[in-house]
């Protein structure tokens, strides 16, 4: 397995690039990638995936993975400031091959007016328009399971929406409902949002703001867990896959490590930092043990963490993309710099040695995105889907082990029974032999007495 880094610069003259994290290979390139900060999103980094970019005009530019020039330019109601994709809900009962033409389920976009737009990509229908914030929406994120959509705006609010309530087109009253949760603890604009992966009842929300704080919330209970106070404005953040640390990119070019667990010096026990709404002020780090300074003095625009949590990938407003070791904080790799600030950074796991840049010629264009809300009549709801052949069920390894264990148990249980049966057979043979000898003796005595 390998990891691929996709970074998109700002401005119409830039080119988005995808490069390998563990080698010098360049996987893909996209020319004329006009986009603004956080107004880009990618469905993946393999054949059939797409890159969506939104610039200063009310247009969405769509690229097919592996093709340098754009495939489509789709008009939208107004310029979008951020976007997010929601995958199709998983269903373990469906077991089909991945089709050539595949699209995510939903595309969400936020605007400078505070409106939230949601399109269904398979049909192009506009399924939701909502006045979500009082000011511009800065960031949108779907949870991994697709249950929640979280929006952060310049009005210092974080709103948690239930996806099902937003896309229920046959019940207008459901779409009028307010957000499930609204967090108003920040005092300045929200700059980034991070949602942890895992079970639905244990999703944590991390939000950063220009007020210099990173706040950790529990979505299930709606409670503030911990507030981390940093010395400068927090521009972006990323969380370790195991939840061990949070990495906050600051406005002066520093990336600060915010540990979520520390060893108690009195008890020598590893304990969680904060909790129960505590405010934790991070101490200065003069020895730079928990700080990455390779981007100074340029503002950090994005931070990502590798799959194993040992590598930090970051970008800044000068166009540099750096790879650093999470333990030593030393730079281990520098990618080809962009000519303008990097506004989008994504890291995906891919198959090593595969055709990363291969363009799927049999692809189809996605439907045009509507600018008017869809009719609530479900009989008029048409979607474009490709059905692939069903995969033959493979033997379940766990079931095979269980069957072998049962067979071994049956063999072990048959051994005592076989021993008992052999013992009874031997005893019967002895009795038969003794009876035969006794009969011969009786016949001999009878002949002697008769004579």
Swiss-Prot record:
WD repeats (start-end): 89-129, 132-171, 185-227, 229-271
Region of interest called Disordered, as start-end residue ranges on this chain: 408-428
A Pfam family this protein belongs to?
WD40
Does this UniProt record's set of keywords contain Nucleus?
yes
GO CC, sorted alphabetically, is: nuclear pre-replicative complex; rixosome complex
Keywords, ordered alphabetically = Nucleus, Repeat, Ribosome biogenesis, rRNA processing, WD repeat
Q: What GO biological process term is on the record, naming one?
A: DNA-templated DNA replication
Under the heading SUPFAM superfamilies, the entry gives:
WD40 repeat-like
- Per the record, the major location class is nucleus
State its location(s).
Nucleus
Q: How does it assemble?
A: Component of the RIX1 complex, composed of IPI1, RIX1/IPI2 and IPI3 in a 1:2:2 stoichiometry. The complex interacts (via RIX1) with MDN1 (via its hexameric AAA ATPase ring) and the pre-60S ribosome particles.
Q: Per the similarity annotation, which family is this?
A: Belongs to the WD repeat IPI3/WDR18 family.
- Stated role: Component of the RIX1 complex required for processing of ITS2 sequences from 35S pre-rRNA.
Please state what the protein is called. Answer: Pre-rRNA-processing protein IPI3
């Amino acid at each position: 397995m390998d990891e691929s880094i996709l970074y998109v610069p700002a401005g119409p003259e830039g080119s988005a690039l995808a490069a390998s994290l563990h080698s010098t290979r360049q996987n893909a390139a996209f020319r004329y990638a006009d986009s603004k900060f956080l107004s880009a999103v990618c469905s993946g980094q393999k054949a059939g995936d797409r890159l969506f970019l939104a610039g200063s005009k009310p247009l969405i530019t769509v690229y097919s993975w592996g093709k340098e020039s754009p495939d489509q330019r789709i008009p939208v109601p107004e310029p979008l400031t951020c976007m997010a994709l929601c995958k199709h809900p998983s269903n373990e009962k469906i077991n089909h091959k991945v089709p050539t033409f595949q699209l995510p389920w939903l595309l969400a976009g936020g605007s400078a007016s505070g409106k939230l737009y949601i399109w269904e990509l398979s049909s192009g229908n506009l399924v939701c328009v909502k006045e979500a914030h009082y000011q511009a929406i800065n960031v949108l994120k779907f949870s991994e399971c697709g249950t929640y959509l979280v929006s952060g705006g310049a009005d210092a609010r974080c709103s948690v929406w239930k996806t099902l309530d937003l896309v229920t087109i046959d019940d207008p009253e459901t779409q009028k409902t307010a957000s499930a949760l609204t967090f108003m603890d920040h005092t300045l604009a929200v700059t980034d949002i991070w949602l942890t992966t895992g079970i639905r009842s244990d999703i944590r929300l991390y939000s950063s703001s220009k007020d210099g704080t990173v706040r950790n919330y529990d979505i299930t209970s709606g409670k503030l867990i911990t507030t981390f106070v940093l010395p400068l404005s927090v521009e972006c953040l990323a969380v370790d896959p195991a939840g061990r640390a949070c990495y906050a990119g600051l406005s002066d070019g520093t990336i600060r490590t915010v540990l979520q667990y520390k060893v108690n010096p009195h008890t020598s026990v590893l304990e969680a930092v904060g909790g129960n709404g505590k405010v934790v002020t991070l101490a200065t780090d003069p020895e730079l043990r928990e700080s990455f300074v390779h981007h100074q003095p340029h503002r950090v625009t994005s931070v990502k963490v590798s799959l194993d949590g040992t590598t930090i990938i970051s970008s800044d407003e000068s166009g540099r993309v750096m790879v650093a070791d999470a333990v030593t904080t030393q730079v281990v790799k520098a990618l080809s710099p962009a000519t303008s600030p990097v506004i989008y950074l994504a890291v995906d796991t891919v198959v090593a040695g595969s055709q990363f840049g291969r363009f799927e010629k049999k692809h189809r264009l996605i439907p045009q995105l509507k600018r008017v809300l869809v009719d609530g009549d479900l009989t008029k709801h048409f979607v474009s889907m490709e059905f692939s052949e069903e995969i033959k069920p493979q033997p379940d390894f766990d079931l095979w082990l269980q069957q072998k264990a049962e067979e071994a148990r049956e063999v072990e249980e048959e051994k005592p029974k076989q021993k008992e049966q052999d013992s009874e057979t031997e005893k019967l043979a002895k009795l038969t032999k003794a009876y035969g000898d006794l009969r011969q003796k009786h016949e001999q005595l009878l002949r002697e007495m008769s004579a």
